[in-house]
Every structure is written in structure tokens, then in C-alpha cells.
Amino acid sequence: MREKVVSLAQDLIHRSSISPNDEGCQKIIAERLEKLGFQIEWMPFNDTLNLWAKHGTSEPVIAFAGHTDVVPTGDENQWSSPPFSAEIIDGMLYGRGAADMKGSLAAMIVAAEEYVKANPNHKGIIALLITSDEEAAAKDGTIRVVETLMTRDEKITYCMVGEPSSAKNLGDVVKNGRRGSITGNLYIQGIQGHVAYPHLAENPIHKAALFLQELTTYQWDKGNEFFPPTSLQIANIHAGTGSNNVIPAELYIQFNLRYCTEVTDEIIKQKVAEMLEKHNLKYRIEWNLSGNPFLTKPGKLLDSITSAIEETIGITPKAETGGGTSDGRFIALMGAEVVEFGPLNSTIHKVNECVSVEDLGKCGEIYHKMLVNLLDS
């Protein structure tokens, strides 16, 4: 299986699919799946290409989810080999997307192919949900496919997202949930004036100082058995004209919260508004909700992937919910059990992104055993 996975991964890496461009990756995948009898449905939205492929006719529906888009390469001169050459050096496959996530995407596809070849009349439905809009806006990708499926009353029972979840060794971590993410873009109004005549102006930075202290020290919650406490970080602050003798007219503050299931986005919005009113600030705020938290509690999917990892590499993975958001947050809206598993994440988005070819082969075996555990038991 390793050779098949690595070969497909190289084919995908060769295509410079900077988000939201697909550059023919999904066509390669669709042609392979179609030969095995998968039903292929294209779901393009604006400049994003999405693929929904399925094999079988009855529940449960087991979906593999992934993305063909990648982040920009950065300075290509810093790479040991060209970022889209997909070279193998000392057992490592190098290239943009090798770990995030064309390698695991290839492993999921080969696993599905091998299972269908051996079990053409399998029970359940094996599906693949693939998008080219995960690394950037994530507005026309998985969420649009999910919305389409929901309007048709189609179900996903279990979903494996192939994000690179492993930390130090393949299989040491699986993600069974993610925190929510919400960003506030806050504009605090003042009155511009000369710094020598502060009584004729109103400095929004000074006015906001106590509010910022409260915002950054407030304890939102203590977390729970599945999630760490909610975290707030200020990402950007800007005010002033660049001159040292002008009191600014406005202060811009951008902050982000990664929040657990102990709070909601509405609770966060309400509390921030209370703080702003408490400090008598003139303001306007724009909120951007990237996704609510989701959690897959111990059950059939988590048991199946845990068992598959134990059988293949002999370790028991730890289920965690840390890290950034993923498209799993959209699929969870369908009521599906969602788990993320993939190769090591230590080089993702970096120069010289790479993945072990041995690990890619193991990923394919693990995904295949997961299918066996879910459909043959």
C-alpha cells in the first residue's frame, strides 16, 4: 500500500494548488474513484472546487474529508528542493502539502480504493468530501457542501478528517474535537487633537487602557475534561497618524478567542459589550465567527480509529481538542461523529515541509483498518 500512497501523494504535490486553486488535483482523484464505481458529484462555488464522491447505497455513511489546496511556499530559495517537485530524500517526501494534507489525502483515497476492491458489495456508504478552500477563507468549501447535503437530507454518520494530528510520533494524537474561534474587530472613537492641548481632544488609547486590562485578564471559564480553558489573545492594535504630536481619533483593536464548550459566542459578545459599556467607551465592533466548538465523545468512530492505530503501530493515541480550527467543525453540524488523524504536523506551513514515506504507508493501513472496524464488525 505504501507505494500506491506515495505515488498518488507525489502526483498531487506536483500541482501548485495554492488556495483556493485546485490545479487538477480533484480530477486525478475523481478519475481513479470513478473506475471503481464511485458516484462523482462536482460542487463548484465561486472560485472553489469541491468533490463529493460515494460508493454504496445504505447507512452508515463513512466519509473521508480533506483538502487539495495548500498555503504559499514562502521563499522557494530556502527549500532544499523545489516545493512542488515532490522529491524523496532519506525516506522523507518533501513538498508543499506533503503533510498538510496531500499525503494523508492520498492515504485516505488508497485505503478507500483497496477496501472497495476487496468488498465491492460492502454495507454502508464510503464517501469522500474534498475541497480546495480550507487554507484560506473556507467560505465556499466544506461548509457549502455540508449545506447542500443537509438540504437533501443526506447524512454523514462518521467522518475522518485527514489533518496532520500526530505530534512527536505517528499515531500519538487524534483530535476528537476543536475549540470554537471568534474574532472581534473593535474601533474605539476619540477626538483628534494636538498633544499639547489634551483638554481639546480625547485620546482613545488612554480611554481604552483599563478596558484592555480587564479584557486580557478576565477568566472566561476553567475548561472541562475535554477542553482547555478559553483563551483570548490580542492580534493587532493600531492608532495614530505616525506623527508624535497628534492625539489619534480612533483606536483599532483586533482580538481572537479560542473557546471551549463552557461558553458560547453569544455569551462572549455580551460580556465584551458589558466591559465596553462599563468603561464608558464610544465604540463599534464587528464580530467574525469562524466556528463553534465541537466534540466527539468516546464511541464507535473513536474506538475504531484507536484500535486501528494500536493494531498497526502498537501505540494508543491520546484524544485531544487543542490547536486551530479545521473543516471538522462544519461536518459536525450534520450530527456526525468527527475525528481527525494524520501524519506529523511539525513541518506544516514551513519551508521544507515533509512527511515520512513509511508514515504515509502506515496512514493508509490505519484508514483501511478503520473501515474494516466500522463496516465489517
Swiss-Prot record:
Recorded GO MF terms: acetylornithine deacetylase activity; cobalt ion binding; succinyl-diaminopimelate desuccinylase activity; zinc ion binding
Pathway this chain belongs to: Amino-acid biosynthesis; L-lysine biosynthesis via DAP pathway; LL-2,6-diaminopimelate from (S)-tetrahydrodipicolinate (succinylase route): step 3/3
Residues engaged in binding Zn(2+) 1: H67, D100, E163
Keyword Protein biosynthesis: no
Pfam families attached to this UniProt entry: M20_dimer, Peptidase_M20
Keyword Transport: no
Residues that bind Zn(2+) 2: D100, E135, H349
Protein name: Succinyl-diaminopimelate desuccinylase
Species in which this protein is naturally found: Haemophilus influenzae (strain PittGG)
Lineage of producing organism: Bacteria, Pseudomonadati, Pseudomonadota, Gammaproteobacteria, Pasteurellales
